[in-house]
Amino acid sequence: MGDALGRPAEGSRTPRFGPAWPISDYQRWPGYQGGRVGTITDDTQLTIVVAECLLTNGCLDPEDLARRLVVWLPDGRGKGVATTQAVQRLTAGIPWYLAGEDSAGNGAAMRAAPIGLLRHAHTGQLRAEAVLSALPTHRNPMAAAGAVAMAAATAWLLGCQPGTCVSSALVTAIQAAIVGLEKEPQPERRPPGRLTTLHDRLGELPALLEQQPEQVLSYLYNGAYVLESVPAALYCFMRSPDDMEQSLLLAANAGYDADSVAAMAGTLGGALGGEAALPQRLLPELEYREELLALADDLWQKALEVG
């Protein structure tokens, strides 16, 4: 849902914030790999790939994931550079543990939520499988940390009731899950280019909730870099944890990597509120709506089976 909303604004360098959102509904997006209103992008496509890998194997099997990525590539929509290059190597026969790019892009983070759903009661397995899920395309430690962060956030929110989400507690849980994964700080992409870690940037989020969205998202810079997009998605969610529509619209209208940030923000809202949290007016035109709901139900049943 988030990527379908945000795709027309992806790459926009002129963020627009409420109260009158320029993007308030699905829009047809023209050009390369354009689609009708409600069309999903690689964010949802790859989340489906991971979910189906988990359902088939009962765990994250990286060899199976690699095969599925190869099948996905020709029909991938809005593919990221690192993911594309890595899957091209997989297609050429390079093993999954050697194919990944040394990239801290968000291609692993945006597809990791199903691991949080399956392993919500098993922190160690969650962390290990989220790291494994990143490696076929992203071997950078920050990319792995981003995948663990999104899986851990999903798992933590599944244990909360709507109306009870405490932002500082969520951030603390994510930080605990990713501690030790980042070998060294990495630079911000915008001046002053300070060195920092995802762990530390996430720690800034509770205080940032006191500021206006345009200030915060200008500071976080919601691009495709894990250091930008994962905190931005969490911010959009935490600003309106019980109103998924507002989270999605904030992320979609912020431009830059709008589809991925909105997709991740929506994932978090869904983990907290379930199907009831989905904006009902956006469901009818959402591509693969029934398949996505069924897949989520199947994965939850699998999670209950494995305990």
What are these regions (language model features)?
Residues 1-307:
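Structured, active/binding-site neighborhoods that engage oxygen-rich ligands
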